[in-house]
Each structure stands twice: as C-alpha cells, then as structure tokens.
Amino acid sequence: MAVTMLQDWCRWMGVNARRGLLILGIPEDCDDAEFQESLEAALRPMGHFTVLGKAFREEDNATAALVELDREVNYALVPREIPGTGGPWNVVFVPRCSGEEFLGLGRVFHFPEQEGQMVESVAGALGVGLRRVCWLRSIGQAVQPWVEAVRCQSLGVFSGRDQPAPGEESFEVWLDHTTEMLHVWQGVSERERRRRLLEGLRGTALQLVHALLAENPARTAQDCLAALAQVFGDNESQATIRVKCLTAQQQSGERLSAFVLRLEVLLQKAMEKEALARASADRVRLRQMLTRAHLTEPLDEALRKLRMAGRSPSFLEMLGLVRESEAWEASLARSVRAQTQEGAGARAGAQAVARASTKVEAVPGGPGREPEGLLQAGGQEAEELLQEGLKPVLEECDN
C-alpha cells in the first residue's frame, strides 16, 4: 500500500509523515533537472520542499521519490498528480482522517451540491436558521479536503503470488482494505470504481479481472472482487490443511519460537476447518517439535520426558519452554565469547612480555656482555607472566 510505504520510509528517515509526499510513476530516464522542475511547478503553492531520496519500484517499473515539506500537508492545495515525463506522476500523502464520520459529513455538504441543491436547503433540513448558512458553508469547505483525501486513497497491491513480493500484500489483507474502500467509494461512478480496483492488481490477479471484464464489460467492481475471493481465497480442503500441519518443519535460519508460532497458525486453521480434533492439537504440536524442529539437548530431553509421561504441553507452555531454551543458548554464547576474548587478550600480553625479555639492554662491563643475573631474572619473570596469562586458557581446556 502506497500510504504504508510513505509512512515506513518517513519513519526510517526520521521525518514526520504528515509533512511527507510520495511521488510515484517517475520514469527511470527522467533526469534530475527535469524532475526538480516538474516538482517546483506543481508544489510551489505548498512552500519549500526537499527531495530526501529515490527508490525503484519493480511493481510500477518506475521510480518513487520521497519529498519533505517545510510544514504539514495542506490538503486543500496538495495536487493528486504532477504532470511529468511519461505521463502524470501520482502523489501519495497520509490522509488527514479515515472512517465514516467525515464521509457522513461529506454526504451532507458535498453530494447535495452535486445534485443541484443549495446549502440553504440543507440548513433548513437540519433546523438551522439562514443566518448560520455561512457557518455551514465554511464547515463544508473545511471538511471537503478530508473527505476527498479518504476517497482518493489508493488500494494496496495484490498480484496473486503465493509469497507476496516486497510492496505487495497478502490476499486477506488486500481483500479487507479493498472491501472497505469499495464502501467508501459509493459516490464514485462504477467505471471509476473498476479503474481503481485494476490499479491495485498485478500479475495473475490482473489478468483474471481483465478476462472477466472482456467477457462481460458490465461486471461491477464488487463482482470482480467476489471472483477474486473465489480464486485466491482460503479454499483449502481438510486434507490439504491437515497435510500442511503434519509436514510443517523448522526452516533454515528460522528461530525456534518463530516456528512454534507458525505451526500454531496451521493448527488453529486445521481446527477451524475440522481437519484436526482440538483434543489432539497439543499432541500433534509436541510430535512436530520432536521430529521437525532443531532442539537443544536439554529441551529435547525435557519434551521427550513429557511425551513419555503422556503430558503434551499447550501452546503457551511450549512457547515458554522454547523461549527459556533460546535465552539459555544466548547466555551460553555470550559466556563463550567473553572467555574467548579474555583468553586471547591474556595470550597477547604474555607474548609481548616474552618478546621484551629477549631484548634486555647491555650494561657497562664489556661490549656484547649482558649481566647473567638480569637475564635470569627477566627470563623467570617472563615465564611467570606467561604462565599467569595462559592460566585462564588452561583452566578452560581442563574444564
């Protein structure tokens, strides 16, 4: 979803999202001078702005740019599109409001005017005197940008892939948001609703809707959404979801606690579809942990003892055991690193002292002659320091 991308990018850059604009659809061959000129022409009424960065979006096959304003977005002045190379560039900003409360006000103050009615008639219907008509008109003008911001909010991106690509949404998330937006777009023409729906589709999903509309151009956006739900919705059979539960295993690089959470999602789904009895969920969870996960020796031993005793941990109990095991592993790793660093430092110090002992300076008493006692003392001292430095390492080896 473009608004989510804007918010995440602003958060990463440390910028207030309400002062940020996301410009989408910029061609790769658009040079910086042309880009800056187009922005200045379109955003001049918004005041000073700064381009914070650019990134290529594969789903659009175009570049996106993050722009920071010197003040919060003025919803009455911000353009929805910027004329530029390759066609208009879309402008995304954080809506000032969301929800039906302002949409309701929009219906009161906006739609009557579209239908040729006067604000005065609305005032009369609300039981407000004509002297307050100007007040009502000002409220309508103030609310309208908020309503328009909600109505013009774009959909997220769904392509039909099993694993959504970066910038795409899973079907469940996309379906929830799209269903809500179709309700918000009640005052928009059906043709425009279909166009906005197609904007949020890529790949297989887009091809499917194109085929549906080619077969029957009169299909509504709601009809197309229902068809997408039939194809990409959760239609797994009991046998399929049961197999997924019984074959789930910890992936390479996946934390054990993350596997427990992923396995629980599958178990809950299987129980909802009655592919797995609730009474057997704990037993299946324990079996998958013992056969499909990478366990530390203490945790493996503890779980096997529980199975032999006929005591299968619940989800929360299993998660608690796993997190204790992960904490123990982390503590052990820190301890090993600390001992290794301490031993390395001691060895380096001992070696330095040993080298220094071989370079005892000559004293008066003959060229090339060195006092025997000094050599013996230096050698003995170096040996003592060496033994002292290696002591932690030797103890570690003994242990």
From Swiss-Prot:
Q: In which tissues is it expressed?
A: Expressed in the brain.
Q: Cross-referenced InterPro entries, in alphabetical order? A: PNMA (IPR026523), PNMA_C (IPR048270), PNMA_N (IPR048271)
Family membership: Belongs to the PNMA family.
State the protein's name: Paraneoplastic antigen-like protein 6A
| Organism for this UniProt entry | Homo sapiens (Human)
Q: What taxonomic ancestry is recorded?
A: Eukaryota, Metazoa, Chordata, Craniata, Vertebrata
